[in-house]
Amino acid sequence: MLKKSDFHYDLPEELIAQGPLPERSASRLMLVPSAPEQFQDCYVRDLPELLQPGDLLVFNDTRVIPARLFGRKVSGGRVELLIERFLGTHQAVVQLRTSRSLKVGNRILLDAGGHAEVLGRDGEFYLLSFDVESPLEQWLSDVGQLPLPPYIHREPDEYDRERYQTVFARSVGAVAAPTAGLHFDESLLARLRARGVEFGYITLHVGAGTFQPVRVALLQEHVMHSEWFKVGAELVEQVRSARARGGRVIAVGTTVVRSLESAMRHGELQPFVGETQIFIFPGYCIRSVDAMVTNFHLPESTLLMLVAAFAGRTRILDAYYHAVQQRYRFFSYGDAMLLFPRNAGEQ
């Protein structure tokens, strides 16, 4: 049985990107073809030469909300709030960071004005009702702070409000960016279109659970967080058309892979709207995509396990070793990989 420790690798802390490069598509791109082909060190801006006319790139069009708030308990203790998802205009599922857990009926006095009341709790998440001056989503857009990942050791600034969004973000609801999409700027998209590459979109609202570590030793015992997603009929038709013309379906990010795999029914992609808790790790056969663009992921994370299921665990760990040796930049604001699938029987 696979263990969490099977997905460990050593990463020097200085390789964790603390901010974006000045140009989105200037990030490096490691090409990881199917074995035994060698890794190639490229740049994201090289993608038009690496892809083929008729290929379909599938993006996640979710938009990050400024979901971080601060306040204090009535007793005076400080509270940090991270909105996980909206439930109507004035309620939300929230993660709280505080010295002591809160109980139903407790109030939080918000620094930005108004207050929130605890209605219930489910594990690490609280259900809060917000008494604020406008609908919660609108209010957050004015007063909320962008929730940068915990491994970025600085406060967010105005530049992050632009750069921690994809240029095609339109469906509001994520608390973390689909980071593979951050590398695509308008110039690169125009060059890909000119190459004959088509674009399609899914929506998956990335939740705060994406940063939660695996806390069990055996992978089979891990329970994934739930996230809302949508695969529309238009995208399903685009995938079918790409397959019919011999084009490849290329996922931009693990959220796209999780969405497409969750929408597979009897071996066929179908339109779907709902929740997914899919956990993809080696032993699972990914059938919905032919390649994927993805960033470098944390050691022992579910995202690293997903890419290992696609490209092979040994192959991925070898690629990560190469990336460390070549001083690639890691995680959300870091560099990317273009992955192709493992060979049959490859571990």
From Swiss-Prot:
Coiled coil: none annotated. Its EC number is 2.4.99.17. Pathway: tRNA modification; tRNA-queuosine biosynthesis. Its main location: cytoplasm. Signal peptide: none annotated. GO terms for cellular component: cytoplasm. The keyword S-adenosyl-L-methionine applies. InterPro entries: QueA, QueA_dom1, QueA_dom2, QueA_sf. Pfam families: Queuosine_synth. It is found in: Cytoplasm. It catalyses: 7-aminomethyl-7-carbaguanosine(34) in tRNA + S-adenosyl-L-methionine = epoxyqueuosine(34) in tRNA + adenine + L-methionine + 2 H(+). One of its GO terms (molecular function) is S-adenosylmethionine:tRNA ribosyltransferase-isomerase activity. Keywords: Cytoplasm, Queuosine biosynthesis, S-adenosyl-L-methionine, Transferase. Monomer. Transfers and isomerizes the ribose moiety from AdoMet to the 7-aminomethyl group of 7-deazaguanine (preQ1-tRNA) to give epoxyqueuosine (oQ-tRNA). HAMAP family: QueA (MF_00113). This is S-adenosylmethionine:tRNA ribosyltransferase-isomerase. It comes from Xylella fastidiosa (strain Temecula1 / ATCC 700964).
